[in-house]
Amino acid sequence: MMPSRTNLATGIPSSKVKYSRLSSTDDGYIDLQFKKSPPKIPYKAIALATVLFLIGTFLIIIGSLLLSGYISKGGADRAVPVLIIGILVFLPGFYHLRIAYYASKGYRGYSYDDIPDFDD
């Protein structure tokens, strides 16, 4: 069995590399090499960030209601841990959703590459 060839510069197997023949009258440049490929959107990471954001928001609201006394089960001894966990869950969700929003709107300095992806 013959091993598959790889592009030595990038280590990509040759079966996944797209080649196109250059015309002999051209100066060696084609439009394809200057086109940017569309960004890969990390849907799983955005879904996880949304879940973290919603759970964190819910825990912050519940912790605030416990602390203020509107919910009378437990008092401040239960409110503070709920608030801390809510903040710890809320912050990464909010951060990654903000990056995803700015990347989708095309703001400069933001891209989907900034969001960690779960490559299977």
Curated annotation (Swiss-Prot):
<dbReference type="GO" id="GO:0030424">
    <property type="term" value="C:axon"/>
</dbReference>
<dbReference type="GO" id="GO:0030672">
    <property type="term" value="C:synaptic vesicle membrane"/>
</dbReference>
<comment type="function">
    <text>Involved in trafficking and recycling of synaptic vesicles.</text>
</comment>
<dbReference type="GO" id="GO:0005802">
    <property type="term" value="C:trans-Golgi network"/>
</dbReference>
<keyword id="KW-0770">Synapse</keyword>
<dbReference type="GO" id="GO:0008021">
    <property type="term" value="C:synaptic vesicle"/>
</dbReference>
<keyword id="KW-0472">Membrane</keyword>
<keyword id="KW-0597">Phosphoprotein</keyword>
<feature type="modified residue" description="Phosphoserine">
    <location>
        <position position="24"/>
    </location>
</feature>
<keyword id="KW-1133">Transmembrane helix</keyword>
<dbReference type="GO" id="GO:0098930">
    <property type="term" value="P:axonal transport"/>
</dbReference>
<dbReference type="GO" id="GO:0005776">
    <property type="term" value="C:autophagosome"/>
</dbReference>
<dbReference type="GO" id="GO:0012505">
    <property type="term" value="C:endomembrane system"/>
</dbReference>
<dbReference type="GO" id="GO:0005770">
    <property type="term" value="C:late endosome"/>
</dbReference>
<dbReference type="GO" id="GO:0055037">
    <property type="term" value="C:recycling endosome"/>
</dbReference>
<feature type="transmembrane region" description="Helical">
    <location>
        <begin position="79"/>
        <end position="99"/>
    </location>
</feature>
<dbReference type="GO" id="GO:0048489">
    <property type="term" value="P:synaptic vesicle transport"/>
</dbReference>
<keyword id="KW-0333">Golgi apparatus</keyword>
<protein>
    <recommendedName>
        <fullName>Transmembrane protein 230</fullName>
    </recommendedName>
</protein>
<keyword id="KW-0968">Cytoplasmic vesicle</keyword>
<dbReference type="InterPro" id="IPR008590">
    <property type="entry name" value="TMEM_230/134"/>
</dbReference>
<dbReference type="GO" id="GO:0005769">
    <property type="term" value="C:early endosome"/>
</dbReference>
<dbReference type="InterPro" id="IPR044234">
    <property type="entry name" value="TMEM230"/>
</dbReference>
<keyword id="KW-0967">Endosome</keyword>
<comment type="similarity">
    <text>Belongs to the TMEM134/TMEM230 family.</text>
</comment>
<keyword id="KW-0812">Transmembrane</keyword>
<feature type="modified residue" description="Phosphoserine">
    <location>
        <position position="23"/>
    </location>
</feature>
<dbReference type="Pfam" id="PF05915">
    <property type="entry name" value="TMEM_230_134"/>
</dbReference>
<feature type="transmembrane region" description="Helical">
    <location>
        <begin position="46"/>
        <end position="66"/>
    </location>
</feature>
<feature type="modified residue" description="Phosphoserine">
    <location>
        <position position="15"/>
    </location>
</feature>
